[in-house]
Each structure stands twice: as C-alpha cells, then as structure tokens.
C-alpha cells in the first residue's frame, strides 16, 4: 500500500514539474537584419573633362568709311573717299565669317546640392574651360579688283555658371546660365586693285572679352557596380570617386561686339598707285553655340 502511494506521489511531482516548465518564458529568435540600400544624391563636388562641337553665330562684319568729301582734316586733293568706297562696293559693307569645328577639349569642376536624396531639386555652381579654336578668314574682291580680307577667331572660352535642375534618381536634367569670357582676335586688311599693291589699310584687335552664356543639359550617374566604373581611368590613377557621371549639354555664348579701326598704313605715293588716306571702321561680333559631351568624377554623397 505504501509502495503504491509513493509511486503515485512521484508521478504527480513529475507531471507538475513538466507543467511548470511549459509555463516558463522562451528566448525569442532575433529579428532579421536588413541593410538599407543607400539612396543616391547629387550633393558633392565633382571634376571632369569634355569634348565639344562649336558653331559661330557672329553675324555680319559691318564696315563703314570714316572720310568723305568735305569731312575732316584729311580732305585734300589726294584724300581717299572711304565713305564712297563702301557705298560703291569697292569695300564691302556687310561680310560674314561663320565657321564650325569639332573635337576640341576642355574641363571643369563644380559643386551640387540636392535638397532631397533620390528625386528632387538640385542647385549648383560650375566653372569650365573649353579650347574652341574657332577661326575663319575670308576675302572679298570688288568689281574693281580691290581685295578686302577679314579674319576672326575665338581661341578659348571660359564659363562660370549657376545650375538649377531636377534629379530623377540618377538622371539629372538642368538649366544653366552665367558669366562667359574668352580670347578673341579680329583682323582686317584692305588692298588696292593693282598687281603687287601692298596693304593700304589694316586694323587688328586681340584681347580678353566678357559676356554671358546660358544653356542646359542632361547628366547620368553610372551605378557603382557598372563596368564603366571599373574601366575608369581615374580608378587606375588613384582617384577615388563615389560615382562617374556622363553628360551632354548645349551652351549659347555671347561675348559682345567690338569696333576695330582700319587705318591707312601706306602714306607714300608710287608710280602705279595713289597714297591711301583716311580710315574705315569694322565692327565684329562674337557669338556662338557649343555642344559638349563628357564625364565627371563625383566626390561626396553616395
């Protein structure tokens, strides 16, 4: 009897212990950890290079005579009536020297700030320089065989512009505008109408001119795992960038106009011609278009 009682007590104790163990709290499994993918932002500094295609839109070179009958102290028996020469077509009054050229290089650097990562408005500032080498020379031969030669060039063009755009993640569409400057060269040479006649009038101007520029473009940030990033030259030069961007843009520039005095340089008379006197004024304009394509190394941000 006692033996049965002890066995029953032991069984009850085991059941009670198992029930108590079932009521104890269990250690929960740790939640899965997800690493968020960084959202791309255009904020940061950048620097890069580009090539360009340039088209001049200089308009016509306007030439006028400064001396006519009864005008000025140079009037005399041998004075050249430069006003009449332009009116009669011996010197052309309106002449064009448009040109275009491809393949010139340049570079630039700047900073962008994006208000909201991912998609959102972007503002920035950029300084760039382009070797344009836009040069053109043309000659006009009058009905009386007088030769007038003009030459005009823009050797290089610099821009300091602001940029405002909207980013669609890695695609940025933007407009730009600001200050433009460049080295210009203007030249005019007028000859007489006889064989071996020297230059009778000449004028030249070369200096830094300033003006304005505006335009727009599109830029694409290559993903960091793209093969283009691995093929980047900067990667092998030790340039550590956080993204490479490809861009294409249009720029319209205007460096204004300049009057060039084309003065007589042949005061002597000879057996076959009469001395040239008086002067002309030729007005040159420097305007044009650039189409630029290139890439940038972006620093900062993601």
Model-derived segments and their meaning:
Residues 2-302:
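Gram-negative outer-membrane beta-barrel domains
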């Amino acid at each position: 009897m006692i033996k049965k009682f002890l066995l029953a007590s032991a069984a009850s104790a085991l059941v009670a212990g198992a029930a108590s163990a079932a009521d104890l709290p269990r250690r929960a499994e740790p939640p899965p950890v997800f690493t968020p993918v960084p959202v791309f932002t255009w904020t940061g500094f950048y620097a890069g290079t580009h090539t360009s295609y340039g088209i001049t839109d200089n308009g016509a070179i306007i030439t006028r005579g400064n001396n006519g009958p009864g005008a000025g102290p140079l009037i005399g028996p041998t004075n050249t009536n430069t006003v009449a020469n332009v009116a009669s077509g011996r010197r052309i009054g309106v002449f064009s020297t448009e040109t275009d050229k491809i393949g010139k290089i340049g570079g630039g650097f700047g900073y962008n700030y994006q208000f909201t990562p991912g998609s959102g408005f972007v503002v920035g500032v950029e300084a760039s320089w382009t070797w344009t080498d836009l040069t053109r020379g043309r000659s006009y031969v009058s009905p009386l065989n007088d030769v007038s030669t003009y030459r005009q060039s823009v050797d290089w063009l610099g821009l300091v512009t602001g940029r405002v755009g909207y980013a669609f993640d890695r695609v940025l569409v933007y407009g730009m505008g600001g200050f433009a400057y460049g080295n210009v060269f203007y030249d005019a040479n007028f000859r007489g109408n006889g064989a071996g006649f020297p230059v009778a009038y000449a004028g030249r101007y070369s200096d830094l001119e300033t003006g304005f520029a505006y335009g727009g473009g599109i830029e694409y940030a290559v993903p960091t795992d793209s093969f283009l990033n691995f093929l980047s030259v900067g990667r092998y030069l030790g340039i550590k960038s956080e993204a490479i961007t490809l861009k294409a843009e249009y720029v319209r520039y205007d460096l204004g106009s300049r009057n060039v005095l084309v003065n007589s340089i042949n005061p002597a008379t000879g057996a076959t011609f009469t001395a040239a006197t008086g002067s002309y004024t030729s007005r040159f304009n420097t305007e044009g278009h650039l189409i630029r394509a290139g890439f940038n190394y972006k620093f900062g941000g993601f």
